[in-house]
């Protein structure tokens, strides 16, 4: 799917309660990593529940171009035959990642640690996103940049070494993408690669490396044990395995918040990943008074999952600490929507990382709130939203800036605001939640093509 085509406006209109049960799409983070580790493993990897959104399909295409055999065997069911560490081939063409920041950055770690040369590119949004933080440690490990756009952006050609150099690297910010890129490059390094993070970020790469047979240790470190030291023993033999992809908590966030703010709603979300490094939004919403019940907690694909029963709730404003940001970095747009229905002020602290997402997400959220009559302010890197416990006015048109999460968040606002809300382009929702529209319609939502009449 091209993100350079004509915009497709979409409008959400307030209506009756939302009711029903759904399984949100497979987790995007785990889907990317399943493709990448399947490429690097020896033998066959079977994936169930893969997210078949544009981002993950771009990563699958890149893995295929680097030598993996990849077959789709049914909905969400994929078979990958890998080439092993050191067995990749130079791709014939450019690796076009579209809008996929995660896929492109993780694959830079893979290419930067192996004896291949590849050119990375993407859409207009990806071309604006900074890659230097990913590249800095990879260059220390022996990779070379053959060519790059200004400021270390794509299009960018990267050449990896015969063997990577093992390093000890302290992350400048809590970032699962940087950590993962270093660990993936370290797979082809003799000896030990160590990553130190001041605050724990998503740990899917560590969990999945372990699942595929790598030796990874994680120990608490830093002030109060909030940080992590991750150590990888290089040049393991990764073995193909079965991966069951749990439902993505970042995608579940949209129907979840919709059920909280549309009066009379009750929705069950099935099989949602409950990894504590991904559930900051649920923790915050419960603090705000949300009626969210965990049912049938169980293990799937190395992760804890649960069914969530969500009922419409009266919410109150809360203070969200900055250290919670890594566990909910993608959920602030939808949290801002929930906060606009709450009684009182919600302050979201330390959101600097939102400025380098698919859009300047902080500015995009603020503009969307302004367009729909929500009282808010930005103070430094903090977002402050004040509600009166009633539905906000709505009636606005929101500029999405090619950002799928901005589009979905403000469509959810439109389901419970006083007047319909239009997003200027809904095409990129397919990036992470291709079935968003039919899923929401099945619950009783009113979401239609075109601008509000």
Curated annotation (Swiss-Prot):
The keyword Ubl conjugation does not apply. Monomer. Catalyzes the transfer of the enolpyruvyl moiety of phosphoenolpyruvate (PEP) to the 5-hydroxyl of shikimate-3-phosphate (S3P) to produce enolpyruvyl shikimate-3-phosphate and inorganic phosphate. The gene is aroA. Its main location: cytoplasm. Pathway: Metabolic intermediate biosynthesis; chorismate biosynthesis; chorismate from D-erythrose 4-phosphate and phosphoenolpyruvate: step 6/7. The active site is at 330 (proton acceptor). This is 3-phosphoshikimate 1-carboxyvinyltransferase. It catalyses: 3-phosphoshikimate + phosphoenolpyruvate = 5-O-(1-carboxyvinyl)-3-phosphoshikimate + phosphate. Its EC number is 2.5.1.19. Pfam families: EPSP_synthase. 3-phosphoshikimate binds at residues 28-29, 33, 175, 177, 330, 357. GO terms for biological process: amino acid biosynthetic process; aromatic amino acid family biosynthetic process; chorismate biosynthetic process. Coiled coil: none annotated. It is found in: Cytoplasm. Belongs to the EPSP synthase family. Residues 1-27 are annotated as: Disordered. Phosphoenolpyruvate binds at residues 28, 101, 129, 177, 361, 405. PANTHER family: AROM/DEHYDROQUINATE SYNTHASE, PENTAFUNCTIONAL AROM POLYPEPTIDE. One of its GO terms (molecular function) is 3-phosphoshikimate 1-carboxyvinyltransferase activity. One of its GO terms (cellular component) is cytoplasm. Keywords: Amino-acid biosynthesis, Aromatic amino acid biosynthesis, Cytoplasm, Transferase.
């Amino acid at each position: 799917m091209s993100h350079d085509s004509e915009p497709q406006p979409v409008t959400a209109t307030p209506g009756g309660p939302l009711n029903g049960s759904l399984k949100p799409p497979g987790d995007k983070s785990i889907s990317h990593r399943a493709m990448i580790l399947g490429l690097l493993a020896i033998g066959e990897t079977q994936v169930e529940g893969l997210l078949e959104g544009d981002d993950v399909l771009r990563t699958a295409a890149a893995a295929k171009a680097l030598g993996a055999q990849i077959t789709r065997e049914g909905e969400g069911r994929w078979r990958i035959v890998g080439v092993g560490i050191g067995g990749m081939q130079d791709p014939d063409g450019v690796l076009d990642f579209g809008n996929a920041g995660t896929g492109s950055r993780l694959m830079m770690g893979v290419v930067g640690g192996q004896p291949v040369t590849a050119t990375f590119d993407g859409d207009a949004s990806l071309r604006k996103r900074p890659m230097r933080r990913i590249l800095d440690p990879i260059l220390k490990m022996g990779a070379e940049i053959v060519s790059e756009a200004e400021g270390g952006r794509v299009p960018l050609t990267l050449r990896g070494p015969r063997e990577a150099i093992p390093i000890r690297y302290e992350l400048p910010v809590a970032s699962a993408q940087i950590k993962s890129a270093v660990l993936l490059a370290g797979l082809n390094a003799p000896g030990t690669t160590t990553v130190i993070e001041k605050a724990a970020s998503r740990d899917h790469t560590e969990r999945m490396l372990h699942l595929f047979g790598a030796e990874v240790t994680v120990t608490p470190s830093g002030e109060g044990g909030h940080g992590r030291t991750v150590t990888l023993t290089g040049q393991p033999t990764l073995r193909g395995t079965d991966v069951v992809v749990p439902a993505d908590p970042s995608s579940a966030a949209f129907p979840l918040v919709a059920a909280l703010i549309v009066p009379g709603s009750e929705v069950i979300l099935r099989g949602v990943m409950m990894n504590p490094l991904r559930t900051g939004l649920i923790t915050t919403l419960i603090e705000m008074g949300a009626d969210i019940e965990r049912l049938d907690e169980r293990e799937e694909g190395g992760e804890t999952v649960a069914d969530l029963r969500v009922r419409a709730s009266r919410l109150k404003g809360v203070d969200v600490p900055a250290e919670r940001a890594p566990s909910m970095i993608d959920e602030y747009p939808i949290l801002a929507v929930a906060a606009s229905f709450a009684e009182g002020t919600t302050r979201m602290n330390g959101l600097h990382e939102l400025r380098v997402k698919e859009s300047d997400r902080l500015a995009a959220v603020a503009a969307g709130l302004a367009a729909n009559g929500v009282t808010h302010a930005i103070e430094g890197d903090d977002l402050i939203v004040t509600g009166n416990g009633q539905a906000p006015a709505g009636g606005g048109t929101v500029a999405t800036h090619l950002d799928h999460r901005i589009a979905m968040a403000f469509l959810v606002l439109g389901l419970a605001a006083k007047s319909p809300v239009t997003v200027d382009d809904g095409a990129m929702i397919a990036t992470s939640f291709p079935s968003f529209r039919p899923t929401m319609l099945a619950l009783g939502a009113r979401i239609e093509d075109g601008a509000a009449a």
